[in-house]
Amino acid sequence: MDSNTITSFQVDCYLWHIRKLLSMRDMCDAPFDDRLRRDQKALKGRGSTLGLDLRVATMEGKKIVEDILKSETDENLKIAIASSPAPRYITDMSIEEISREWYMLMPRQKITGGLMVKMDQAIMDKRIILKANFSVLFDQLETLVSLRAFTEDGAIVAEISPIPSMPGHSTEDVKNAIGILIGGLEWNDNSIRASENIQRFAWGIRDEDGGPPLPPKQKRYMARRVESEV
């Protein structure tokens, strides 16, 4: 196993522990707690994949961080902060919406680009809106936390979420996953609309009816992929 992979995991475990302490002392906001829960699942998945104990990894990560801080100067910190752009956190969904349990009568799912696409194929003739929580860097979607599809009465009928045990995803991965989700839902004559944030930061444009600018041919192609590959 690559030593850098192990070191990265150990440091991530310790930094998560520090963030958890802040949360326990009520020193963070809702997006911070949201990311904390998601990252906990991701660390458990990575730990299982690597065969490493989280508690032991956290202690080793503490040693690594302490060694780095001993040699770090305030001037180096200032330079690093000044040269690193900070991502913004976009929230279409409330904590209740992003954490609510939901169930599928006719479950379908597909893995694409480190993302899991889930949808209920029993949903028909509904008006559906896509909402997402994600980080933005350089005015473009950087990391998806969660995307969910809601009916007009608030029922959750589909979801896209990162797979904890897999490496990160790109903006193109997210766009492809959304295309698969839209294609699958539109197959049953549902009307899909993406939130303004998804339109702006995933595609960078908006079309006239407020839906994501996905050509009909691509939607049909994505729908066929759902039928044949899921």
UniProtKB/Swiss-Prot annotation:
Entry's Gene Ontology molecular function annotations: protein serine/threonine kinase inhibitor activity; RNA binding
Coiled coil: none
An individual GO BP term: symbiont-mediated suppression of host type I interferon-mediated signaling pathway
Pfam assignment, any one: Flu_NS1
Alphabetic keyword roster: Eukaryotic host gene expression shutoff by virus, Host cytoplasm, Host gene expression shutoff by virus, Host mRNA suppression by virus, Host nucleus, Host-virus interaction, Inhibition of host innate immune response by virus, Inhibition of host interferon signaling pathway by virus, Inhibition of host PKR by virus, Inhibition of host pre-mRNA processing by virus, Inhibition of host RIG-I by virus, Inhibition of host RLR pathway by virus, Interferon antiviral system evasion, RNA-binding, Ubl conjugation, Viral immunoevasion
RNA-binding as UniProt keyword: yes
Motif (Nuclear localization signal): 34-38
Region (PABPN1-binding): 223-230
Family statement: Belongs to the influenza A viruses NS1 family.
Functional note: Inhibits post-transcriptional processing of cellular pre-mRNA, by binding and inhibiting two cellular proteins that are required for the 3'-end processing of cellular pre-mRNAs: the 30 kDa cleavage and polyadenylation specificity factor/CPSF4 and the poly(A)-binding protein 2/PABPN1. In turn, unprocessed 3' end pre-mRNAs accumulate in the host nucleus and are no longer exported to the cytoplasm. Cellular protein synthesis is thereby shut off very early after virus infection.
HAMAP family according to UniProt: INFV_NS1 (MF_04066)
Name this polypeptide is given: Non-structural protein 1
Source organism of the structure: Influenza A virus (strain A/Tern/Turkmenia/18/1972 H3N3)
